[in-house]
């Protein structure tokens, strides 16, 4: 099969008139090659390629000529190619490197790509790990963002359950950070009392320091021996007075510690009973939902059965008794496993000051009675309303 012929006359119509030949001079081309000739004789054959292109050639001839051109170009590896692609001098390269070293932008860009000395770059696995590290980090960040969005949308992002001590500490911090404008005078009085107590403590500390100095200086056999009787009696009076003062302060601090411990126990018991009541209320709600579903299914089945059977009587004694029993249960409370006082609502008035220990004790008793479904709930609730919410 003959190879197809290729005509290049149409492509080079604009090139032919550009060359003007003179009888005595060499041809001059306006669009041709560069005016200077290649110095290397091995590369001089490239100048004749432009003249050979303008002819009828087949595809096979073009391929062969292309191979010849490649052979001519890569035949002599020692040929000088500075005229084709000039190479920079070593001095120019050093100057460019020095200027790049002084550039802050270049340093900031290249510092992130410095290889670590601990890694062996000859290991083929290192390149794969380093290449995929950024992709893995990006994928992890995208997963975290997606999980956060899904949690926020679905309401899963709930706060963790806190212990009773943590809840009490948070309540105390909230109460401390919310001052009461109505009790500013009491706060000022307490501050004055605190200042007085701090002053008394400072006085006691000063007396104690003075006594320790005298003890260190004089409480030796020789020091006491050289002291007079009046000095000894004065020192004895000072020691006895300091002992009395320190004993009173110790008793006061111990009483304060007992009060704080009792208050902490009351708060812990209040939080514990409150959590137990909330859990039981949640269980009761779930149980009521299940009962409603079962009741709805039973009603549907009864309707289907009644529809299939013809009613003989419009009213019966059994139906009337069932209606009366259901009405009594709804009026006076349900019997059995249903709790009557568990869902009792306790009225509470939010104040700027924290509830006192007595108030917490009353609330704890009400919650404990609600948990046990005790009949004392109405009585305790009435006492709480009369003594705390509406005192006479």
UniProtKB/Swiss-Prot annotation:
Record has Lipid metabolism as a keyword: no
GO biological process: cellular response to growth factor stimulus; establishment of cell polarity; establishment of mitochondrion localization; hippocampus development; mitochondrion organization; negative regulation of autophagosome assembly; positive regulation of anterograde axonal transport of mitochondrion; positive regulation of neuron projection development
Region (Disordered): 1-36, 175-196
Pfam families on file: FEZ (PF07763)
Any one GO cellular component localisation term in the record: Golgi apparatus
Processing after translation: Phosphorylated by protein kinase C zeta; which enhances interaction with UBE4B and polyubiquitination.
Keywords from the named record: Cell membrane, Coiled coil, Cytoplasm, Cytoskeleton, Membrane, Microtubule, Phosphoprotein, Transport, Ubl conjugation
Main localisation: cytoplasm
Compositionally biased intervals (Acidic residues): 180-194
Any one GO molecular-function label of the UniProt entry: protein kinase C binding
InterPro entries: FEZ
Highest taxon of source: Eukaryota
UniProt key word Chaperone: no
Subcellular compartments: Cytoplasm, Cytoskeleton, Microtubule organizing center, Centrosome; Cell membrane
Phosphoserine PTM positions: 58, 298, 316
Coiled coil regions, renumbered to chain: 230-298
Similarity comment text for this entry: Belongs to the zygin family.
Function (record text): May be involved in axonal outgrowth as component of the network of molecules that regulate cellular morphology and axon guidance machinery. May participate in the transport of mitochondria and other cargos along microtubules.
Subunit structure, interactors included: Homodimer. Interacts with the NH2-terminal variable region (V1) of PKC zeta and weakly with that of PKC epsilon. Interacts with UBE4B and SAP30L. Interacts with SCOC and ULK1; SCOC interferes with ULK1-binding to FEZ1. Directly interacts with SCOC and UVRAG. Stabilizes the interaction between SCOC and UVRAG during amino acid starvation.
The protein, known as: Fasciculation and elongation protein zeta-1
Lineage of the species this protein comes from: Eukaryota, Metazoa, Chordata, Craniata, Vertebrata
The encoding gene: Fez1
């Amino acid at each position: 099969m003959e190879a197809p012929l290729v005509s290049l006359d149409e492509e080079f119509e604009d090139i032919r008139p550009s060359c003007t030949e003179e009888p005595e001079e060499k041809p001059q081309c306006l669009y041709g090659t560069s005016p200077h000739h290649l110095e290397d004789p091995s590369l001089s054959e490239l100048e004749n390629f432009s003249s050979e292109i303008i002819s009828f050639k087949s595809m096979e001839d073009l391929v062969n000529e292309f191979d010849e051109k490649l052979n001519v170009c890569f035949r002599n590896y020692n040929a000088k190619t500075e005229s084709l692609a000039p190479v920079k001098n070593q001095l120019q390269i050093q100057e460019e490197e020095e200027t790049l070293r002084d550039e802050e932008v270049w340093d900031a860009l290249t510092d992130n790509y410095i290889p670590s000395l601990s890694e062996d770059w000859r290991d083929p696995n290192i390149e794969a790990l380093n290449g995929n590290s950024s992709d893995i980090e990006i994928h992890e960040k995208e997963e975290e963002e997606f999980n956060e969005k899904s949690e926020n949308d679905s309401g899963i992002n709930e706060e963790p359950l806190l212990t009773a001590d943590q809840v009490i500490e948070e309540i105390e911090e909230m109460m401390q950070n919310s001052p009461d404008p109505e009790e500013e005078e009491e706060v000022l009085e307490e501050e004055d009392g605190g200042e007085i107590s701090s002053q008394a403590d400072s006085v006691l500390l000063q007396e104690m320091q003075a006594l320790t100095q005298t003890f260190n200086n004089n409480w030796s056999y020789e020091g006491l021996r050289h002291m007079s009787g009046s000095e000894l009696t004065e020192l004895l009076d000072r020691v006895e007075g300091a002992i009395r003062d320190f004993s009173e302060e110790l008793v006061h601090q111990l009483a304060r510690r007992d009060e704080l411990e009792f208050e902490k126990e009351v708060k812990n018991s209040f939080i514990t009973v409150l959590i137990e009541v909330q859990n039981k209320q949640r269980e009761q709600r779930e149980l009521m939902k299940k009962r409603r579903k079962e009741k709805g299914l039973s009603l549907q089945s009864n309707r289907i059965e009644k529809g299939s059977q013809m009613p003989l009587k419009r009213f019966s004694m059994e139906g009337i008794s069932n209606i009366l029993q259901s009405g009594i249960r709804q009026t006076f409370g349900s019997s059995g496993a249903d709790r009557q006082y568990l869902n009792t609502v306790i009225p509470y008035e939010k104040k700027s000051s924290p509830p006192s220990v007595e108030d917490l004790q009353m609330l704890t008793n009400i919650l404990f009675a609600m948990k046990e479904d005790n009949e004392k709930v109405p009585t305790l609730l009435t006492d709480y309303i009369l003594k705390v919410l509406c005192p006479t």
